[in-house]
Regions:
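Amphipathic, well-ordered alpha-helical segments in soluble domains
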Residues: 13-23, 43, 50, 138-141, ...
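Alpha-helical rod/repeat scaffolding segments in eukaryotic adaptors/tethers
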Residues: 30-37, 80, 128
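Acidic, Ser/Thr/Gly/Pro-rich intrinsically disordered interaction regions
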Residues: 70-156
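A structural signal for long alpha-helical coiled-coils and helix-turn connectors
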Residues: 21-25, 55, 150
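Short acidic alpha-helical/loop segments enriched in Asp/Glu that coordinate divalent cations
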Residues: 27-30, 53-71
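Charged alpha-helical initiation segments
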Residues: 1-35
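Hydrophobic packing residues in well-ordered alpha-helices of helical domains and bundles
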Residues: 10, 33, 37-40, 135, ...
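Short, hydrophobic, well-ordered secondary-structure elements
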Residues: 36-57
Length: 156
């Protein structure tokens, strides 16, 4: 798959998440809002995988779509990939949008009640009942990271 079509797939995932969150704010019933937010989380996680696929292809990394494996592959090639380094820092910060995405996605996947899915010591921006505010924050943060990565990649 070419770089432009990889970018297109990532863009489609992020746009789908944005549209699902918009629909969620227009809903009157809680179950539908929760369903749309869960669907948006899936699209966001898929968008993150899309970004990882773009990086993997751009840097010719042989690893699977796993942040740690991609970092190891980059280190083995003797290269530093700024977007992977940034994601690693975010992953290690329990308060980051990336950690929130992983927690919320896993909770949705496991059909857990949102408020019970978060770790007791983790303070999140929002928890499921915030009308998608935290999910919108994740969307804007991921979108910003994708755009910065592409801008940096275009300079080289």
């Amino acid at each position: 798959m070419s770089g432009s079509s990889l970018a297109s797939v990532t863009n489609q995932r992020l746009d789908a998440a944005r549209r699902l969150l918009q629909q969620a704010t227009e809903m009157d019933n809680d179950w539908m809002t929760q369903s749309l937010e869960s669907s948006a989380l899936f699209q966001l996680r898929s968008g993150l995988n899309g970004l990882l696929q773009e990086v993997k292809t751009s840097y010719s990394l042989p690893a699977a779509l796993d942040l740690d494996l991609l970092l190891q592959a980059a280190n083995a090639k003797g290269i530093s990939v700024p977007v992977l380094n940034e994601l690693a820092l975010l992953k290690n910060n329990d308060q980051s949008w990336l950690s929130q995405l992983h927690i919320a996605f896993q909770a949705a996947l496991d059909c857990q009640v949102a408020n019970q899915s978060y770790g007791a010591g983790v303070e999140l921006i929002g928890r499921g009942s915030d009308a998608g505010t935290s999910t919108k924050y994740i969307l804007s943060s991921l979108t910003e990271l994708v755009l910065r990565y592409r801008e940096d990649a275009a300079e080289y």
